[in-house]
């Protein structure tokens, strides 16, 4: 398997793990917020505001995973080293 194939595979696995964690975290946050509003409807404004801030923090994990995956795919700092190594091995 080539270096670039490994980069694509690593980026795909990294993005999958990042979004899986984000989805689970957001689901648990919304579940807790809905339970809190059902117990105390008067505090729904504060609960929803806190939930939205929490969801933004949770979503940042997926954004960071996406940025790292894009760096791996398009701006890989090891690309030149891998190409030189491949040329050396081919000789």
Curated annotation (Swiss-Prot):
It is found in: Cell inner membrane. InterPro entries: ATP_synth_csu_bac/chlpt, ATP_synth_F0_csu, ATP_synth_F0_csu_DDCD_BS, ATPase_proteolipid_c-like_dom, F/V-ATP_Csub_sf. The chain crosses the membrane at residues 4-24, 53-73. GO terms for molecular function: lipid binding; proton-transporting ATP synthase activity, rotational mechanism. The record marks 59 as: Reversibly protonated during proton transport. Coiled coil: none annotated. It holds the Pfam family ATP-synt_C. It is a multi-pass membrane protein. Keywords: ATP synthesis, Cell inner membrane, Cell membrane, CF(0), Hydrogen ion transport, Ion transport, Lipid-binding, Membrane, Transmembrane, Transmembrane helix, Transport. One of its GO terms (cellular component) is plasma membrane. Belongs to the ATPase C chain family. F-type ATPases have 2 components, F(1) - the catalytic core - and F(0) - the membrane proton channel. F(1) has five subunits: alpha(3), beta(3), gamma(1), delta(1), epsilon(1). F(0) has three main subunits: a(1), b(2) and c(10-14). The alpha and beta chains form an alternating ring which encloses part of the gamma chain. F(1) is attached to F(0) by a central stalk formed by the gamma and epsilon chains, while a peripheral stalk is formed by the delta and b chains. NCBIfam families: ATP_synt_c. PANTHER family: ATP SYNTHASE LIPID-BINDING PROTEIN, MITOCHONDRIAL, ATPASE PROTEIN 9. HAMAP family: ATP_synth_c_bact (MF_01396). F(1)F(0) ATP synthase produces ATP from ADP in the presence of a proton or sodium gradient. F-type ATPases consist of two structural domains, F(1) containing the extramembraneous catalytic core and F(0) containing the membrane proton channel, linked together by a central stalk and a peripheral stalk. During catalysis, ATP synthesis in the catalytic domain of F(1) is coupled via a rotary mechanism of the central stalk subunits to proton translocation. Key component of the F(0) channel; it plays a direct role in translocation across the membrane. A homomeric c-ring of between 10-14 subunits forms the central stalk rotor element with the F(1) delta and epsilon subunits. This is ATP synthase subunit c 2. The lineage of its organism: Bacteria, Pseudomonadati, Thermodesulfobacteriota, Desulfuromonadia, Desulfuromonadales.
